[in-house]
Design a protein with these regions (language model features):
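N-terminal secretory signal peptides
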Residues: 1-9, 20-29, 33-36
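N-terminal export leaders
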Residues: 10-15
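Extracellular low-complexity, O-glycosylation-prone Ser/Thr/Pro/Gly-rich "stalks"
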Residues: 40-397
Length: 397
């Protein structure tokens, strides 16, 4: 698998675009179009991928778990029906309560088997309740969905235990990941079979409880834990007034001060960039000249703003490496980036302790704790160009 900083900017490109990690509520899906013009909505695809859902949560029986598969095909908002076909999102789908009911019930017992056609989107699971997706008109007058935003207290889905995985399935293959970029709630595992047999996202025994306990006990982080329902990512916590907007400022300032007097080297697929802070901008020379303003704590946590990563092959990959270095707090200790030894991550007092906690919760140490977590391949991401099946498991908690 090609490392994140050596791919065209990754999670938003190959998996899903919902406004990046900083989706606001109500979140209207704006998934990136894929080359699927030959796939009419509603067709039963001969190359549909077998999708198996396994409820091993140990806390909820199958009757208490509901599935929602929503996303995009050829730029159009779609959802998977229980019959395995894609249906376009329509404003008329809203019921008397103002929301759609796109739930797919699990089998009465055992595994639930579905067929996944070419599309890009999310697989949501809701435990003990139903999710409320609202069909609305987007800026062009087309039907779109407002997605759950479990980190927003006023969201109608705030009280529902839920989580999701992300994927793109097209002629090139299956590209998928579990995600904790926005929050961590339900432990999910993905197994992708095909040319290889790969599993990612598996939370270790007791890992969920340990992550909740760790974050709850950290100064400045405790308010991110919502009962036993979810941990909100600190970027969303910042927007909600639950996390210090200047939390990382001392570390950011020290990075800026340090690299006023020495070089930082960043290696990407384009080559090696050498940078110094000049006039309060971190300017890199190399295959191209790129520069960045001093980021805020919010910019770092969302990997956006001053660290926005355009899909240009130069600025974007350097921004991704910087974003990962800030979140993992490796920029001062390692003047050559990216850092590839996980034992060097999160070793300072000021770091993304949320990302550290969710990585520690997984069996293989991989997680999507922030948007650039796939730099140096530490994200819970897998892909296969010849897939034969995808298995999503709600693991025990």
């Amino acid at each position: 698998m090609t490392p994140r900083h050596q791919r065209p900017v990754g999670r938003r490109k190959v998996l899903f675009a919902l406004g990046g990690a900083a989706v606001a509520a109500p979140a209207v899906a704006a998934l990136a179009p894929h080359a699927l013009a030959e796939d009419p909505v509603g067709r039963t695809a001969a190359d549909a991928l077998p999708l198996t859902i396994v409820n091993d949560s140990g806390s909820f029986d199958n009757a208490s778990v509901r599935l929602y598969i929503v996303g995009n095909q050829d730029g159009r908002q779609v959802r998977l029906t229980p019959e395995g076909t894609l249906a376009p999102v329509s404003l008329s789908d809203n019921g008397p309560d103002g929301f759609t009911d796109y739930a797919i019930e699990l089998a009465g017992s055992g595994e639930t088997r579905l067929s996944l056609p070419h599309m890009s989107g999310r697989i949501y699971v809701a435990l003990g309740g139903r999710l409320k997706f609202k069909a609305v008109a987007d800026g062009d007058g087309n039907a779109a969905l407002q997605y759950p935003a479990g980190w927003v207290e006023s969201d109608p889905n705030y009280g529902v235990l839920h989580d999701c995985a992300e994927f793109t399935y097209n002629a090139a293959g299956m590209f998928c990941n579990t995600t904790m970029v926005d929050m961590f709630s339900v432990p999910l595992s993905l197994r992708l079979t095909g040319a290889d047999d790969q599993t990612t996202g598996t939370v270790r025994d007791g890992g969920r409880a340990a992550a909740f306990e760790t974050v709850r006990g950290l100064e400045g982080y405790s308010r991110l834990v919502v009962d036993d329902t979810r941990i909100i990512a600190p970027g969303h916590g910042l927007d909600a007034g639950l996390f210090d907007k200047d939390y990382l400022a001392p570390y950011i300032d020290e990075v800026w001060s340090t690299y006023t007097g020495r070089d930082l080297k960043v290696t990407t697929n384009a080559g090696t960039f050498t940078g110094r802070v000049r006039g309060d901008r971190f300017t890199f020379d190399g295959p191209a000249q790129v520069s960045f303003g001093r980021p805020s704590t919010r910019d770092v946590l969302f990997c956006d703003g001053a660290l926005a990563a355009p899909n240009d092959g130069t600025t974007g990959p350097v921004a991704a490496v910087l974003g990962a270095g800030f979140n993992r707090s490796t920029l001062l200790s390692h003047p050559e980036q990216p850092t590839t030894d996980a034992s060097d991550f999160y070793r300072t007092d000021l770091t993304n302790h949320y990302a550290k906690a969710v990585h520690e919760a997984t069996e293989d140490g991989r997680a999507y704790g922030f948007a650039f977590d796939d730099v140096a391949d530490f994200a819970s991401y897998i892909q296969d160009t010849a897939p034969t099946g995808l298995r999503l498991t709600l693991t025990r908690f």
